[in-house]
């Protein structure tokens, strides 16, 4: 099947990009409004990416915590760490997720088409059907939680992202850079710490965390990108 024959998508633009030696398409998914960019060429390192606009209006690190959390089990992959399990068996050339001040992206690449399909399936189910609504402990594990120190009995705060950002904020260069952005872009997503300020992260509630997913992790707010030598029509039909 040709891309032009797919009824679920509207072709907004189609042209050949000589500098990239690629046939390019910009599409819109009719049912959801999701945007799709395609670069079809002879590169066997096939790439898939889904991203969402996730502006941060505070420094609680909600987008960063959500990036971690959606990869901790989903409707079709109800295990603690499907991302890690796929890493053990996949032959991918790249598999990651990143949070920026204004977006969150989930990119992957593989030279094996079956491997790419498996990873795409896992990523799409993770972002749209995560287990975060059924299991609050995912938020507590990846974000923040109270703990009692077994030795001293003191009340402490722990969490994967919290501890990661404590490491970031222990670097003077990072603190200097953060203060520059605070000064240049006050009260915007670029002036806040998208990764989360360790002193502010505990202000994030579970309900606010879920609301952030409901608001931004929707197909209408997504951008999907496919690149390389593959059956693009088959991939688009699968995504639909």
Language-model region placement:
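Beta-sheet entry/capping signal
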Residues: 24, 35, 47, 105, ...
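Charge-rich, well-structured scaffold segments of protease-associated domains
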Residues: 1-7, 55, 69, 73-240
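Active-site recognition of the HExxH zinc-binding catalytic motif
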Residues: 60-72
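Short pre-active-site segment immediately N-terminal to the catalytic Zn-binding motif
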Residues: 51-61
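Short, hydrophobic/aliphatic alpha-helical segments
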Residues: 41-53
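N- or domain-start disorder-to-order transition segments that initiate the globular core
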Residues: 1-43
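Short, solvent-exposed loop/edge-beta patches enriched in aromatic
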Residues: 30-32, 43-44, 57-59, 74-76, ...
């Amino acid at each position: 099947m040709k891309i032009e024959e797919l009824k679920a998508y509207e072709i907004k633009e189609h042209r050949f990009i000589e500098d990239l030696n690629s046939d390019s398409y910009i599409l819109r998914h009719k049912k959801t409004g999701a945007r799709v960019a395609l670069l079809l060429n002879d590169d066997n390192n096939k790439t898939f990416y889904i991203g969402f606009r996730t502006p941060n209006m505070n420094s609680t690190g909600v987008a960063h915590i959500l990036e971690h959390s959606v990869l901790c089990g989903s409707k079709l992959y109800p295990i603690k760490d499907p991302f890690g399990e796929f890493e053990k068996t996949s032959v991918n050339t790249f598999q990651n997720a990143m949070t920026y001040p204004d977006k969150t992206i989930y990119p992957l690449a593989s030279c094996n088409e079956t491997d790419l399909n498996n990873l795409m399936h896992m990523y799409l189910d993770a972002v749209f059907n995560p287990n975060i609504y059924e299991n609050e402990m995912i938020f507590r594990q990846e974000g923040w939680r109270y703990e009692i120190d077994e030795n001293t009995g003191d009340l402490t705060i722990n969490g994967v992202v919290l501890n990661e950002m404590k490491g970031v904020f222990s670097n003077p260069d990072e603190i200097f850079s953060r203060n520059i952005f605070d000064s240049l872009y006050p009260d915007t997503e670029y002036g806040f710490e998208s990764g989360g300020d360790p002193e502010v992260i505990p202000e994030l509630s579970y309900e606010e965390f879920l609301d952030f997913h409901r608001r931004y992790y929707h197909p209408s707010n997504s951008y999907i990108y496919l690149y390389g030598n593959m059956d693009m029509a088959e991939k688009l039909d699968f995504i639909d």
